[in-house]
Design a protein with these regions (language model features):
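Conserved ABC ATPase "signature" region
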Residues: 34, 86-105, 213-214
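ABC ATPase NBD coupling module
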Residues: 35-52, 78, 200-204
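Hydrophobic anchor residue at the start of the ABC signature
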Residues: 72, 124, 135, 148, ...
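Short catalytic/signature loops enriched in Gly
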Residues: 101-105, 196-238
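A short, proline-enriched helix->beta-strand linker immediately N-terminal to the Walker B motif
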Residues: 129-133
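A short, surface-exposed alpha-helical micro-motif characterized by mixed small hydrophobic
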Residues: 177-179
Length: 238
C-alpha cells in the first residue's frame, strides 16, 4: 500500500535521505560493500554508477531547462569527467538502446516536448548509461497509461535480461508484480511481513498479503462488495 515504506527503502540503499533520518538496519550488503557504513565520497562511486534508481515520474525528475540528451550525457560525465564527445556518443547510443526513434532529434528536445512514455525511456537510458550492476525501479510506470506501461516494462525486462542486471522493482500493483518479478517482498508499515516467490502469491501465508490479493477486483468473478482488509496489531511486532 502507499506509505508502507517501499520507496523509503530504495532511497535508503543510496543514502538519499536527509542526515537526520535513522536507518535501523545493522548493515546493507551489496556485493563486497556495506552501504550502511560508506562515506559520502565512497557512495558517489556507487550511486549512479554501480546502483542506479529510476524514479516514478519523469516530469519531476528531468530538468525542464536542459535538453534531454545533455541530461543523459551528464550522467556519464559525472563518472567520466572531461569526455564530452564520448558522453554525447554514448547518450545517442542509449537512446537507440531504449528504442527511441530519431535519437539525434530527440537528443535536442526539452522535457515538455516529449511524451510520458518517451520521458520514462529517457530516464531508463540515463540510469543505464553508466552500466550499473543493480537498478532500483521506483514505480517506473505508475504515471503511464496501460498500453505504454506494458511497452516500458517489456523494454526494461529485455534490458535487465540482456545486460545481466539485478533489479529491485517497487510497485503497489500486485498483478503487475506477479507477472514481472521473480520474488516478492511484501511490506506493511515499514516492515517486510512476507517474502515469497511471485508464482506462489496465490498461496501466500501472511494475512496481510492474503488481504491485498482478496481485495483485488476480478472481471471473471464479480463481487458486489470487495472485502475490507482487517488489520491486526500483531503485524507490527511479529
Amino acid at each position: 500500500e502507499s506509505g508502507s515504506g517501499k520507496s523509503t527503502v530504495g532511497r535508503a540503499l543510496l543514502q538519499l535521505h536527509p542526515k537526520k533520518a535513522r536507518v535501523s538496519a545493522s548493515r546493507m550488503q551489496f556485493a563486497d560493500l556495506d552501504l550502511q557504513h560508506l562515506s559520502e565520497a565512497q557512495m558517489r562511486g556507487v550511486r549512479g554508477k554501480r546502483i542506479s534508481m529510476i524514479m516514478q515520474d519523469p516530469k519531476y525528475s528531468l530538468n525542464p531547462v536542459v535538453c534531454v540528451g545533455k541530461q543523459i550525457a551528464e550522467a556519464w560525465l559525472t563518472h567520466h569527467p572531461g569526455r564530452k564527445d564520448e558522453a554525447k556518443a554514448r547518450a545517442l547510443e542509449m537512446l537507440e538502446v531504449v528504442r527511441i526513434r530519431q535519437p539525434e532529434r530527440v537528443y535536442q528536445l526539452y522535457p515538455h516536448e516529449i511524451s510520458g512514455g518517451q520521458g520514462q525511456r529517457i530516464m531508463i537510458a540515463m540510469m543505464l548509461i553508466t552500466d550499473p550492476e543493480l537498478i532500483i525501479a521506483d514505480e517506473p510506470t505508475s504515471a503511464l497509461d496501460v498500453s505504454v506501461r506494458l511497452q516500458v516494462l517489456g523494454l526494461l525486462d529485455d534490458l535487465v535480461q540482456s545486460r545481466g542486471l539485478g533489479l529491485i522493482f517497487i510497485s503497489h500493483d500486485i498483478n503487475l508484480v506477479r507477472s514481472f518479478c521473480d520474488r516478492v517482498l511484501v511490506m506493511y508499515a515499514g516492515r517486510v511481513v512476507e517474502s515469497i516467490a511471485a508464482k506462489d502469491l496465490d498461496h501466500a501465508r501472511h494475512p496481510y498479503t492474503q488481504g491485498l490479493i482478496n481485495s483485488l477486483p476480478d472481471m471473471q468473478h464479480r463481487r458486489p462488495i470487495l472485502p475490507v482488509l482487517q488489520r491486526q496489531a500483531s503485524w507490527l511486532t511479529d
